[in-house]
């Protein structure tokens, strides 16, 4: 009888672990999507500061006159990504910028984001899992 009880407990534990793994993977992907949407809103609002007459944006770290300069945008984005966001796949770090636009998603870059000015558009790309890359473009005026 004891052997049967132990076997049943083992089976239940195995099923529970598999179900829990699927649940956490889905939650991480949803958190990465949420981060991406929040970044879109954040950078849209920051760019509007310049249109409304402010002189600086992105944590007061960039002059509005530099909003068309790619490396300035990337520097400001790096500051925000590492201080205000967490990578749901690597919870001990912020959301570091990854390489350049159009990067390929893989296990190593899940949850990472790239923010860059390209052709006077602020482009935000986030790897929400190991295959799916979300992209959004905000016109810079």
Predicted ranges, named:
Residues 9-13, 32, 75, 79:
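Alpha-helical interaction segments
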Residues 25-54:
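Membrane-proximal N-terminal amphipathic helix
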Residues 21-24, 37, 43, 72, ...:
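Compositionally biased, intrinsically disordered low-complexity regions enriched in proline and serine
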């Amino acid at each position: 009888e004891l052997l049967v009880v132990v076997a049943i407990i083992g089976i239940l534990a195995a099923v529970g672990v598999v179900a829990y793994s699927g649940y956490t993977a889905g939650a991480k992907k949803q958190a990465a999507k949420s981060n991406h949407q929040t970044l879109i809103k954040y950078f849209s609002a920051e760019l509007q500061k310049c249109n409304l007459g402010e002189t600086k944006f992105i944590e007061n770290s960039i002059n509005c006159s530099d909003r068309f300069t790619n490396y300035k945008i990337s520097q400001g984005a790096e500051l925000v990504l590492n201080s205000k966001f967490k990578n749901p796949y690597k919870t001990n770090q912020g959301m570091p910028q990854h390489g350049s636009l159009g990067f390929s998603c893989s296990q190593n870059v899940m949850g990472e984001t790239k923010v860059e000015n390209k052709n006077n558009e602020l482009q935000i790309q986030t790897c929400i899992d190991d295959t799916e890359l979300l992209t959004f473009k905000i016109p810079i005026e």
